[in-house]
């Protein structure tokens, strides 16, 4: 294998990678050894030294070693195994909700155990829930890690340990194979080489300052951030050039349907909505495809803007497709559009992954014949077997869940008779202007900066978890005395959907016991779509008082009677995501409240962030504050808003680099076209395909 380029070495050549693991790795776009080396850690854990159990502080992640004192299984309410260990300085209780007989047998009294996890304050002193542990052999000194331990973004069925072992093999290959240096010499001078940077980031020595890594300031990160931002900018330059070569159906003014809808509405559009609709209509009258991003705060009325844009296309006898990220949100859109469009004689179709057999077939036939003019659904609407009949406009709701390459794939799927559909992309995640210019440089941007009248601002309070019982009483009062409904949102910092679902289930059990007089529902990401739909429908119809949920309810769910939201561990989420969640209440005329139920002690930055939410309901103000206050160790921004197009760069954190990166990208685009193409291929392979279209 000596001398080969690592972008040509498949992962199947690594020890332990068979067909099943290859398929799982492909789900996170890992196909070659180069892909794996560019799959960088989300964060790091310091497992290089031991903490005395007696000195553990709540909230600290630590490695401890101790002798097993006892290990017991209890069956009260929920099966649980507890194991107590001691190192002489104190006693730690390890708590497991998922365990096997083999685990119980391995933790025999007298055995020595090395454990890593988050220390918490329990009923009987220090405890860790589901720590990682290893039973020690006869060695007098524990086997500690020699480098900081990386935590990678992963997918179901791929463990951290697997990714770490595979990455070790990939790093060894750097000695015998090559990874191409693509930066022109005048740029890379004085910088770390690519192999050096990759070794440092995958296996940082314990002497390296964690704060440097957490703030993205380490030279190894700067080397890769520069390359990734350049690739992103180069891809935007290529896409802009490519888009101008496409043709779209020009849709001139035809306002009969629009005027009918406006006359039937019980309210008048805001000035901001009217301005944005005018910008969209100007674009749609041209013979090149519109590519416009509409930003609007939670509840600003983006759906009406989308409806008015859709009517322009339908008035010309064309079809419109609206794609939402979840079936939950797509179904809600379908209902809204039916209420508005059916009185105008417009048929609204609905396509989602859960549809099977005859229902799906008849819906596909209605779309292919042109009987259905407005099609609403999830990504299922762009599957191979769906044939459109004159598709002229594609609306994508919640852009941050669809990557650049996904929105470009819609061009390909929607193309008919040489015409490409116009594209309208809507997001409720406000982005400060400088960042929007970079993240969406291939799009024109409109902003709905005005809320409709009659919305009640949500009152937000931050309360420590020690007052949990008071909050449960507050939920009881809201649901029974006031006749309202409430959300209880569980958050988890882990990248595992399974652990998040388990946390939500545990909270659901707890609240059912504490509130026997309430009907309590549960919704999380691992439930089947049909189960989620059924629970949400029950909540919307008022059959459930309280909904325990993970962050799956972040987007678009609309239940006007819900006036109270509890968010557990809000310190784990970014401001934008907290603001999105809070937007699920305050959708009716009644006063609404959001309780941020935090664990103590709070970091200084977390305190400031929660204060921002208490002080403001304006998403654009909150986005700007997010830029100003994000402190060390809090990797928010692109990863947490779901913009997975960036592996190492963070548009919020790295914004100071953006003007220079834009200048350098133009230089490379003009002077080094081959390197430009290779950079896009390395960092954004899907986009590269479309920029050649």
Swiss-Prot record:
Supply one GO molecular-function term: ATP binding
Q: What's in the keyword line of the UniProt record? A: ATP-binding, DNA damage, DNA recombination, DNA repair, DNA-binding, Helicase, Hydrolase, Isomerase, Nucleotide-binding
- Please list the residue ranges annotated as the Helicase C-terminal domain: 482-628
Q: What is the lineage of its organism?
A: Bacteria, Pseudomonadati, Pseudomonadota, Gammaproteobacteria, Enterobacterales
The Helicase ATP-binding domain covers which part of the protein?
Answer: 283-448
Q: Which NCBIfam families match?
A: PRK10917.1-1, PRK10917.1-3, PRK10917.1-4, PRK10917.2-2, recG
What remark about domains does the record contain?
Answer: The wedge domain within the N-terminus inserts into the replication fork junction, where the lagging and leading strand split.
Q: Tell me, in a sentence or two, what this protein's role is.
A: Plays a critical role in recombination and DNA repair. Helps process Holliday junction intermediates to mature products by catalyzing branch migration. Has replication fork regression activity, unwinds stalled or blocked replication forks to make a HJ that can be resolved. Has a DNA unwinding activity characteristic of a DNA helicase with 3'-5' polarity.
Which residue numbers does the motif DEAH box cover?
Answer: 397-400
Q: What is this protein called?
A: ATP-dependent DNA helicase RecG
Please state the Enzyme Commission number of this protein.
Answer: 5.6.2.4
């Amino acid at each position: 294998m000596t001398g080969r380029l690592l972008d040509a070495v498949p992962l199947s050549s690594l020890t332990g990678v068979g067909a099943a693991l290859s398929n799982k790795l492909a789900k996170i776009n890992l196909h070659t050894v180069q892909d794996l080396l560019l799959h960088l850690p989300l964060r790091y854990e310091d497992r290089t030294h031991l903490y005395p159990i007696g000195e553990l502080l709540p909230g600290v992640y630590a490695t401890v070693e101790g002798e097993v004192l006892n290990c017991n299984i209890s069956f009260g309410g929920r099966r649980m195994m507890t194991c107590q260990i001691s190192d002489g300085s104190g006693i730690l209780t390890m708590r497991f909700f998922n365990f096997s007989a083999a685990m119980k047998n391995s933790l025999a009294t007298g055995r020595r155990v090395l454990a890593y996890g988050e220390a918490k304050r329990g009923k009987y002193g220090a405890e860790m829930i589901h720590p990682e542990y290893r039973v020690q052999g006869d060695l007098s000194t524990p086997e500690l890690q020699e480098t900081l331990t990386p935590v990678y973004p992963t997918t179901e069925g791929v463990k951290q340990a697997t990714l770490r072992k595979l990455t070790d093999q990939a790093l060894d290959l750097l000695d015998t194979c090559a990874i191409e240096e693509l930066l022109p010499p005048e740029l890379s001078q004085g910088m770390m080489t690519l192999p050096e940077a990759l070794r440092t980031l995958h296996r940082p020595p314990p002497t390296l300052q964690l704060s440097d890594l957490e703030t993205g300031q380490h030279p190894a990160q700067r080397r890769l951030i520069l390359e990734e931002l350049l690739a992103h900018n180069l891809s935007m330059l290529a896409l802009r050039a490519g888009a101008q070569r496409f043709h779209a159906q020009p849709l001139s003014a035809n306002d009969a349907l629009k005027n009918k809808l406006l006359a039937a509405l019980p309210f008048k559009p805001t000035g901001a909505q009217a301005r944005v609709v005018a910008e969209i209509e100007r674009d749609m009258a041209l013979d090149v495809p519109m590519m416009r991003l509409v930003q609007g705060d939670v509840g600003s009325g983006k759906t009406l803007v989308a409806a008015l844009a859709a009517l322009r296309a339908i008035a010309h006898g064309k079809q419109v497709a609206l794609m939402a990220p979840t079936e939950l949100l797509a179904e809600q859109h379908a209902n809204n559009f039916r209420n508005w469009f059916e009185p105008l004689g417009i048929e609204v179709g609905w396509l989602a992954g859960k549809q099977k057999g005859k229902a799906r077939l008849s819906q596909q036939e209605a779309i292919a014949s042109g009987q259905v003019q407005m099609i609403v659904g999830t990504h299922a609407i762009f599957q191979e077997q769906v044939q459109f009949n004159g598709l002229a406009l594609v609306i994508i709701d919640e852009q941050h869940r669809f990557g650049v390459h996904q929105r470009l794939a819609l061009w390909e799927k929607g193309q008919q008779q040489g015409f490409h559909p116009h594209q309208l992309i809507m997001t409720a995640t406000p982005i400060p202007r400088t960042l929007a210019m970079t993240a969406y440089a291939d799009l024109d941007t409109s902003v709905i900066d005005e809320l409709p009248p009659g919305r009640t601002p949500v009152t937000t309070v931050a309360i420590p978890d020690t007052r949990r019982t008071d909050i449960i009483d507050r939920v009881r009062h809201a649901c029974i005395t006031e006749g309202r409904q409430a959300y209880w949102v569980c958050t988890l910092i882990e990248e595992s959907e399974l652990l998040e679902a388990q946390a939500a289930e545990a909270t659901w059990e707890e609240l059912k016991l504490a509130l026997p007089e309430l009907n309590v529902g549960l919704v999380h990401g691992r439930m089947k779509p049909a189960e989620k739909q059924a629970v949400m429908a029950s909540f919307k119809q008022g059959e459930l008082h309280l909904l325990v949920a993970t962050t799956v309810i972040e987007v678009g769910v609309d239940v006007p009677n819900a006036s109270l939201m509890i968010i557990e561990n809000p310190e784990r989420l970014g401001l934008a995501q907290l603001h999105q969640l809070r937007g699920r209440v305050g959708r009716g005329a009644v006063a609404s409240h959001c309780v941020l139920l935090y664990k103590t002690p709070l970091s200084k930055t977390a305190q400031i962030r929660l204060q921002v939410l208490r002080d403001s309901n304006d998403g654009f103000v909150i986005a700007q504050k997010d830029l100003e206050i994000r402190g060390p160790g809090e990797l928010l921004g692109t990863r947490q808003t779901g913009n997975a197009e960036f592996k190492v760069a963070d548009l919020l954190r790295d914004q100071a680099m953006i003007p220079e990166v834009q200048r350098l990208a133009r230089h490379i685009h003009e002077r080094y076209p081959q390197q430009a193409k290779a950079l896009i291929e390395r960092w954004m392979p899907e986009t590269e395909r479309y920029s050649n279209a």
